[in-house]
Amino acid sequence: MNRRHFLSALAGTSLAGLLAPRVSASALLDIRPGIDTDLDLSIVRAAMGIHPGLYRFQSPRAAERGLAAFETAYRAAAAREDMAGAYLALSRYLTTLRCGHSYANFFNQDDADVTALFAKRTRLPFWFRWVGSRMIVTSDTEGHALVPGSEVERVNGQRVADLLAALLPFTRGDGSNDGKRRALLSVQGQEEHETFDIFQGLIAPPGADGLHRVTLRAPDGQRQIRELSAIDLERRRAAMTRAPDTGDAPRWTWDERPDGVSLLTMPGWAMWNSTWDWRGWLEERLDSLAGAKGLVIDIRENEGGDDCGDPIIARLIDRPLTGWPFETRLRFTEMPALLRAHSSTWDQSFYDLGKGARPLGGGEWAPREDVIQNAIAPATKRIACPVAALIGPTNSSATFGFINAARASGKVRLFGETTGGNRRSINGGAFLFVKLPYSGIEFDLPLKGYVGRGAQPDRGIDPDTRMPFDPAWLGAPKDPVIEAAAAWCAGRD
């Protein structure tokens, strides 16, 4: 952090008192005003004072230890004037919450010193996905003659299972759902910032020569050691296959197959930077389903965004459907002034979500009725054909909500793998983008907690037909999951 002179002094505080759920966070702030690192840490404390999932997957004692470890690491990074160390300290701390929506969001950083961390020439020059603790090459994007389906055994002398174990503690996810974390640590050309690239570049970069020494075993069993030049952010983005989130171009595809089944592929639902009329496009194609044998919806690479699946559900139901098996909880009635001063959001009403909330005890409140998830109303137009959805561990936000509603409707069969998200509890719905003024790092703070009704497993949603990814599928002329879903729709299974 060459433009800032970090000060590492910080007065001690009682962490148990800080995190006590019944104490207003605003009463515990401003420990030593005017010291920059203190201000950053006070803002983090204020955020944790209202975080809806702080105690969902950890005890107050564990939360206390986690915050203490973060403070120590952040102060150490400050003393070294180490931006990477500060970013890693915050990232590691936020993952201890086991909340898939709490992280130092790569896409929301606007500080030049922070974004510089993400652009370096440290990336592996191929795409891959994790199958358990195995790293499987899926595409040779840089022309190194790597065979898809090859298994990477070592990177720069380190076993890939050990590399995965080193990166998982920095990777967001809900509860114990490591399937989501492995999905985020796969590189498939879907994101402008890949989670693996960020943390591998900071934790396990190539040597000074810029080469990755990779040991691979090809599908035919032949083992080879390759020296591959690392690539930078620009090169990674040049190989992306996902349509940009901006502009008015269609983001999804619709294919009418020879067997009479229509395939709707939806790789993303984040529409806030797009001028595309996605709803009109979707409604027009749903109107064309008269006489179709079935509809297959592929959302396997789609984390979420807007509630773009609602128009589909609306055509499948006869009465309003919430499809959301969670109760909404808040941990504040009044937004701390420090967070108001050091955050932004797209909807200013989020700062007042706690007004009129009903106390539940234990530092939690039930929000007003207008804050709770809205039901989906049935549409006048119907989908009469069978409907299947292809799901997987990437689904954890709006797509997790869609899959819950799809299952609740009783009209959609789910194919694929267990989703991301968590049936016990997730957080989201409304966010603050919190900016730490001294380091310049931003992190996302969800405001609504969603708690499962009754005892729920600490995992995502399981499919009706389980079809885990098989490396043997790479290079196959047809996608086996799509074919299985289409066969079910057409009555051929």
Give the role of each language-model region.
Residues 386-408, 413-424:
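Extended C-terminal subregions enriched in glycine
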Residues 5, 12, 17-19, 25-329, ...:
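Flexible, low-complexity junctional segments that flank or bridge functional domains
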